[in-house]
Amino acid sequence: MFCLLCLCLTLGVWAFEPFRFAVVTDIHINVHAQTPSDDLRQTVAAINSDDSTDFVLVTGDIADAGDGASLRMAHDLLSKLNKPWYIIEGNHDQNWSESGCMDFLKIFGYERFTFEHKGIRFIGIPTGPMMRMAMGHVAPEDIDYVTSVLRSNGKGADAEPVFLVSHMPMQPADVDNWYELTDAIRPYPVVAFINGHYHRDLHFTYDGIPGIVNVTNLRQKGHSAGQYNLISLAADSIRVYTQAVGGTRHCWLTLPFTTHNDDDSTHWAPRPSYAVNDDYPQVTEQWTRDQGAAIFSSPVVWNKRVYAADNAGRVVCYDHEGQELWRHQTGARIIGTPAIGKGIIVVASADSCIYGLDAKSGQQRWCVRTGAPSVSAVTITDGTAYVGSGDHRFRAIRVSDGKVVWQADGIKGYVETRPLVIADKVVFGDWDNTLYCLDRRNGQRLWTWQPPNKDNMHYSPAGCWPVAADGCVFICDPERAMTAIDLNSGQQRWRTYQSKVRESIGLSQDGRRLYAKTMQDSIVCYAADGQAPRELWATDCGFGYEHARVMLVEKDGVVFASNKDGLIMALDGKTGRLLWKHKTGNTMINTVEPLSRNRIVFTNEAGKVGELGVRS
């Protein structure tokens, strides 16, 4: 009798006309590969021939390399659908975007969506990681968007049931702040999440809320076409089918249609632990500020002021106690770390401008327009700013007035790194498998270097900030190798896979030691020796699996590192002895800025800016 009553209540509250929609995900379009576009073309034709499908959700990983050409190809193919379709970004679209994800916005017209269909509401958001190798992350501005829509939708009997649409599943292993979203939506009538990412059909539960993970559109081995999913909604049930293009359809999941999800917190995923902070009570957060938008760049410190640039396109200036002094709004997100010289903060924006702002007042002094968005970090030396852009040009700009001193054309990929300026040379990597060395005086190309796996852009030497010592440039790249390259000739001196490093590197202040973060637990130190790789020490810091591309920085004999899980670590630079660890959150900490061995300024992906203090 009780079950019948519940069913009647469900039918009474959620009375709507049953309908069906399609989910197409992980299409991985590549302008250089025929099969993914063929698979999508056939899927579009199959959906068009099915009059019982009302609309289509396209749930991320649209372009395999996040490039504009592949996104445009995907748009052209999807535009042939004869029914409405709604799209969101996946990690491939956000992590390796030459435009800082501005191409996606320009081509598809939005980065998040909401719509109502036959009494059911759908909300779609991106889940990162944005321009960094890190965990998935729901940006604070996207959580605000979801909660704003849910508040408008209401909680009562007249509120529409809601489906949340995202590429990444809301699991601890996928999205570092999953709990912030599940906690935010819990009071509202959420039915389920609809996801992609895993390339196969899966049913998860995210803190008591069902998650429907859908199979990739890419064809399975031995098949000549791909597949997609169909989701049928009725007042009492959700049924999920996989439809092979030109083949059979099978139902692989049936769920009750309900918003009464599991509220027993003992069944939820464990929340992040901050117990490590109890082990090192000498470390405290002196001040923190929530900037209200994701931050993907390091803090900049100048004249007792702290500057942070964010995903909302703002540069915000704080005093040494964290009080905001000014903010300047650019036209699009800022990804790369700015730099300050001659009292001017130089920042590259995805609005296709490089700005020079007065570091005291925030007033714009000048702007250099580029032919495409820029996500590059900036280096300033002797009054000249060196910065890359998405228009395949690298520029040297006079800081005082914004005059372009020179520009180097023909940079094949986009530039993300902070350029290394050493003697008469400028060294930087791009996301087309190339490390460049230019003449600092005129931009003339002196040499280039490429990794062994030079045909796969995902192995590009582009994420790490190069360092130089002993006549060599040192880098770590995604092939899990550390490499020494002759600074004058560009010839490879040595390359080692010994420590399984990734894209994080640093140099001691005396130029004698290289620091790197491995992909499992350890910080390692090598001699800054151009003749052969020689490990000096390795310390197990216990941080687990790691792949965030954040650099290591030494100050006053202490080397500082950070990771994807919100941990900042300090080690003795000479011995590797672990001095302390402190967890500031559960998301990626950008490369930190130490003021001394006992004061460290940091930013994180959640939009937090702050300073740590260490008691001696």
Predicted regions located by residue number:
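N-terminal active-site segment of His-dependent metallophosphoesterases
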Residues: L9-M73, A159
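Extended active-site neighborhood of metal-dependent phosphoesterases/phosphodiesterases
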Residues: D67-A159, E180-A192, L202-N214, H223-A234
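Short loop/turn segments that connect beta-strands within beta-propeller blades
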Residues: D319-Q323, D358-G362, R398-G402, D439-N442, ...
